[in-house]
UniProtKB/Swiss-Prot annotation:
Keywords: Amino-acid biosynthesis, Cytoplasm, Histidine biosynthesis
GO biological process, any: histidyl-tRNA aminoacylation
Family label: Belongs to the class-II aminoacyl-tRNA synthetase family. HisZ subfamily.
Assembly: Heteromultimer composed of HisG and HisZ subunits.
Species of provenance: Prochlorococcus marinus (strain MIT 9303)
Associated pathway: Amino-acid biosynthesis; L-histidine biosynthesis; L-histidine from 5-phospho-alpha-D-ribose 1-diphosphate: step 1/9
Domain of life: Bacteria
Gene Ontology CC annotation, any one: cytoplasm
Misc remark: This function is generally fulfilled by the C-terminal part of HisG, which is missing in some bacteria such as this one.
Name the record gives this protein: ATP phosphoribosyltransferase regulatory subunit
Biological role stated in the UniProt entry: Required for the first step of histidine biosynthesis. May allow the feedback regulation of ATP phosphoribosyltransferase activity by histidine.
InterPro entries: aa-tRNA-synth_II, aa-tRNA-synth_II/BPL/LPL, HisRS-like_core, HisRS/HisZ, HisZ
A GO molecular-function descriptor: histidine-tRNA ligase activity
Amino acid sequence: MALQPAAGARDLNPQQVELNQKLSQRLAEVYRLWGYDEVSPPRVERLETLKAGGAIASQDIVRLVADEPLGLRPEMTASIARAACTRLRQRPRPLRLWAAGTIFESRTADEGSLCIEENLQSGVELFGVEPINAEMELLSLLFSAVETLELSKQHQPRLLVGHTALMDLIMLPFQNDLREKIRTALIHYDRLALENLQLPNDQFERLLHHLECRGEPLDVLERLSGLFGTQQALNNLQRLFEQMGPLAADQGIDLQLDPTFQPHFELYTGLVFQLVCQSDAAPVVIARGGRYDNLVARCGAKGLQAAGVGFSFAIDDIRELLTKEIKASEAVESTLVAYGDQATLEHALKRQRHWHKQGQRAVVELEACHDREEAFSRLADRGCSTLDWLDH
């Protein structure tokens, strides 16, 4: 029998499970305050759904052996979008939904073998609202949710924002295969790849300018307006950042606009963003999201019905980031009910019920102790802070 979990699988201890639940509950309370209803999408879906119309690569999906092509969900947006366009299609828009659950990604390990990456997510989806109104609510909700996580300055939270329309503007002068090569180089911040394309000097310098055109959103928008003139996407972003700037400043979140930023999954057809924090070892993405109208349209929606935005939090990564803070602020008091030779286990169990009726966590020591001192010495091992000693 194998004594280690599969590579990439999560094998959480009780404390980690408890912290995950606390984080999920905090976020769920915020979602409910904003009028979002909980749904529970299936872990197993048809591959056609999981691929999201080609937006998610086959190699990112964990496939199952079955009579029909099935896989484990690498994210929950596609499944929720399908439900919104089928079972929930008669519900009025805006349609506000939230979900929490495990996702599974297939990845290649360092030695070249395939393994499963298992993660807990919590997030929201908003259907039936056009730009930029949906994005205004979505990011406002994001900031409200982040506030409950109580990030500190040492985490250096930064919201990185992009927009597919900005990348389209940059790509306008280029065609076909060259267009895709340039796009890939910009997304990966690969100057060498751009040099190897041997573009005319003016085009190369312009692309380098776009590559370096990132930073404070309003400054970047001013520079982009000078290059591309009046554009609806730029106007929408201007309005969005004017609204989000004060909210971000209140929470110490740095806003950064990057015209070449595009996420790993090609779901998005508008605003895209990710929230990055600094851990002890390296930067970590704790939330990501954006607009995915094309995905909703592929599920059969038409017109304004084919509009969707959403985001998700990476609960496991947030837990690792905040473990020390949560442990220090939310330690739970627990009582150890122990008994000596003059009492019995039955007495201890009855006493335990007394504590439980008061809503107090209580654990029974199942073997009799010689004396109070022995019982007291077992407190730490049992995870308890106080002793209830029975000896008569």
